[in-house]
């Protein structure tokens, strides 16, 4: 069925979406996510209701439900925006920092950029990721979002490992599948980041340095080519 409406004179009348209206809707959606994240982190996922989130965001509960049909949808988008580093439909692996990282001249620079990008991602998203993991068992929608998220992460790690393989940089005897598993285990664990930064007073830069060293030790050939 067409979305184009007809005016009184029979001429087609298209939905009106001014830049100001689109921007206002985007800002309202951002305000809802910010309010939800604040309450989730302060009070926990389970005790936080959609009504309280709406009140915190300064919108009607119906408005919140029109944007996000459930708490799980809200948390999933909070995580997605944090992981991607911004709004929009482009996945992480199609955004400029990732593309530029894979195109870096030397393997050492590729690994350093990957580690630094991972630290920045964890700084933005680790707490929301941890919250999703902690509550997935009791929320079927979160379970689904968790499975999708893990699949996306593994796909990104596979792309990274494949890029290293194509440049002759994987350690001897290491194939793309095993390299992907190692990267998935050591680079996509928000608990490790939070333990180091919260309990050991590490900075994100120190975490990036650790990831750099681990990848270099476990995944990269001793003298990789720069091809």
Could you describe each region identified by the protein language model?
Residues 25, 29, 79, 111, ...:
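Amphipathic, non-transmembrane alpha-helical scaffold segments
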Residues 71-73, 77, 88-123, 180:
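Hydrophobic alpha-helical connector segments
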């Amino acid at each position: 069925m067409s979305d184009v409406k007809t005016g009184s004179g029979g001429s087609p009348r298209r939905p009106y979406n001014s830049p100001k209206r689109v921007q206002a809707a985007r800002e309202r959606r951002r305000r809802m996510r910010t309010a939800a994240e604040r309450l989730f982190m302060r009070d926990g996922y389970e005790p936080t209701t959609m009504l309280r989130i709406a009140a915190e965001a300064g919108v009607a509960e119906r408005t919140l439900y029109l944007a996000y049909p459930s708490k799980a949808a809200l948390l999933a988008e909070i995580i997605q925006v944090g992981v991607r580093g911004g709004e929009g439909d482009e996945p992480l692996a199609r955004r400029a920092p990732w593309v530029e990282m894979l195109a870096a001249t030397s393997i050492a620079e590729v690994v350093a950029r990957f580690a630094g990008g991972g630290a920045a991602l964890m700084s933005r998203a680790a707490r929301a990721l941890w919250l999703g993991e902690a509550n997935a068992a009791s929320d079927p929608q979160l379970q689904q979002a968790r499975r999708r998220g893990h699949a996306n992460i593994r796909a990104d790690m596979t792309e990274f490992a494949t890029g290293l393989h194509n440049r002759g940089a994987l350690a001897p005897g290491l194939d793309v599948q095993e390299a992907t598993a190692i990267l998935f285990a050591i680079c996509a664990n928000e608990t490790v980041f939070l333990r180091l930064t919260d309990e050991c007073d590490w900075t994100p830069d120190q975490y990036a340095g650790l990831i750099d060293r681990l990848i270099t030790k476990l995944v990269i050939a001793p003298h990789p080519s720069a091809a």
